[in-house]
Regions:
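...captures the hydrophobic TM-helix bundle architecture rather than a specific catalytic motif
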Residues: 1-194
C-alpha cells in the first residue's frame, strides 16, 4: 500500500498533513521543556541559596548568537528552494549544519571544564538542572543535524523528483530548528544570567 504525499492544505485544519504533524510534535516538545522549566522554577524558588556565576556567560552568549545565525541560514535555505536556487539552498543548509556543530563543540568544552573541576550533575541541584536542560537541548541539536545531513546527502535526490515535497520537508525541518533555537533563547538567560 502506498499512501500519497500531499502538499495541499486540508479543509478541516487549513494545514498540510506534514505541517500539522510537525506542529503537534512541537506541542509535545513544548510540554517536555515546559515541565523541565517548571521544575527549575520550583527548585529555584524553594532553594535557600542558589549559585550564581558558575557558568561562562561569554560562551553562552556566543552560543546564542551562533544559534540565531543558524536560524537565519535555515530560513535562507528554505527561501532559496522557493526561488528554485538549489546551489544557495545547499550552501545555507550546510552553513546551518556547521553552525550547529560549532554550538555542540562549544558545549563540549563547557561540559569538559565543569567535569574537570568535579562539577558534574551530582555536584549541586543547579548543575543537575543545567546538565539536564542543556543536555536534552543538545540531543535536540543532534537530531536536527541528523535530519539536515540526510537532506544534504541522500535525501537531496528528492529535489529532482518532487521539488514541492522537498521544499515542504525543509520547511518542517526549519520549524523544528527554530523551536530548538527558541528553547536556547529561554535557557540562556535562565541558566546563565539569573
Amino acid at each position: 500500500m502506498n499512501i500519497p504525499y500531499t502538499v495541499e492544505e486540508r479543509p478541516d485544519t487549513g494545514l498540510a498533513n506534514g505541517k500539522l504533524g510537525i506542529w503537534l510534535f512541537l506541542a509535545s516538545e513544548v510540554m517536555l521543556f515546559g515541565a523541565l522549566f517548571s521544575t527549575y522554577i520550583i527548585l529555584r524558588v524553594s532553594a535557600v541559596e542558589w549559585p550564581h556565576g558558575e557558568l561562562n556567560v561569554w560562551l553562552g552568549m556566543a552560543n546564542t548568537f551562533i544559534l540565531i545565525a543558524s536560524s537565519v541560514t535555515m530560513v535562507m535555505a528554505w527561501a532559496s528552494l522557493k526561488m528554485q536556487d538549489w546551489a544557495k539552498h545547499r550552501l545555507y543548509l550546510i552553513l546551518t549544519f556547521v553552525l550547529a556543530g560549532i554550538f555542540l563543540v562549544n558545549k563540549y568544552f563547557e561540559y569538559a571544564d565543569h567535569l574537570s573541576r568535579g562539577e558534574g550533575p551530582s555536584h549541586s541541584t543547579f548543575l543537575a538542572i543545567y546538565f539536564t536542560l542543556t543536555g536534552l537541548h543538545g540531543l535536540h541539536i543532534v537530531g536536527g543535524m541528523i535530519v539536515m545531513a540526510y537532506f544534504i546527502g541522500p535525501g537531496a535526490k528528492l529535489w529532482k523528483k518532487n521539488a514541492d515535497q522537498f521544499a515542504n520537508r525543509i520547511e518542517y525541518t526549519g520549524l523544528y530548528w527554530h523551536f530548538v533555537d527558541l528553547v536556547w533563547i529561554f535557557l540562556f538567560p535562565v541558566l546563565y544570567l539569573l
